[in-house]
């Protein structure tokens, strides 16, 4: 729980242009729903500057909540892995969330990315993310369930439209780079079961 009057510092990690757009969109949108958050997105200037390690280290140290914007193209990106590793060392698992764009599933992730709570950029998953952030605010900063629902329902349509654009950009990037996803084990098992059922029907 945060100290009285303290805003929650949310570190949003990205790598690649579609992921950066997603991070910036979340940075701008989150305070519309929960005013007691202070989202941070690292800029290209920080990443390429001579003092990047010191500056990033300070931001990561002060972070209360971490969000990764993951796409099929950035799962092995050095920046994502560095920031994910630093966040996972500092924060408990419930305070770490990955937003999976471009058809990603948990089966596509390896450590440290697999340590995060994984959500899709869908309405109910984003609602759960907002609810989790709200639960970890200082008591006097927390919104009631009714307030949270009101603010979320008001601002969700704006985010939804931007997510559609991001999804198109992610799919275009994935296609241009020839990235292929792992198949979800559950999906493979379902396919095997369906094939087995069809075989049994043919034998009957």
Regions found by a protein language model. Name each.
Residues 2-28, 104-204:
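C-terminal interaction surface of TIR/SEFIR-family domains
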Residues 21, 51, 79-82, 187:
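Short, well-structured alpha-helical interface segments that form or flank functional binding sites
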């Amino acid at each position: 729980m945060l100290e009285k009057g303290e805003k929650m510092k949310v570190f949003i990690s990205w790598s690649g242009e579609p992921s950066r757009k997603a991070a910036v969109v979340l940075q701008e949108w989150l305070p519309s729903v929960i005013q007691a958050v202070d989202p941070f997105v690292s800029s290209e200037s920080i990443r390429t500057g001579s003092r990047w390690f010191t500056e990033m280290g300070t931001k990561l140290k002060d972070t209360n909540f971490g969000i990764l914007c993951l796409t099929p193209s950035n799962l092995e990106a050095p920046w994502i892995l560095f920031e994910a590793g630093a966040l996972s060392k500092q924060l408990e698992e419930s305070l770490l969330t990955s937003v999976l764009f471009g058809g990603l599933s948990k089966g596509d992730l390896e450590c440290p990315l697999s340590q995060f709570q994984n959500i899709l950029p869908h309405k109910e998953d984003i609602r759960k993310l907002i609810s989790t952030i709200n639960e970890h605010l200082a008591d006097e900063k927390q919104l009631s369930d009714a307030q949270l629902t009101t603010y979320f329902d008001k601002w969700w349509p704006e985010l939804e439209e931007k997510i559609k654009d991001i999804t198109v950009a992610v799919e275009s990037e994935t296609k241009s780079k020839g990235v292929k996803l792992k198949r979800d084990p559950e999906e493979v098992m379902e396919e095997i079961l369906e094939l087995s059922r069809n075989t049994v029907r043919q034998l009957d």
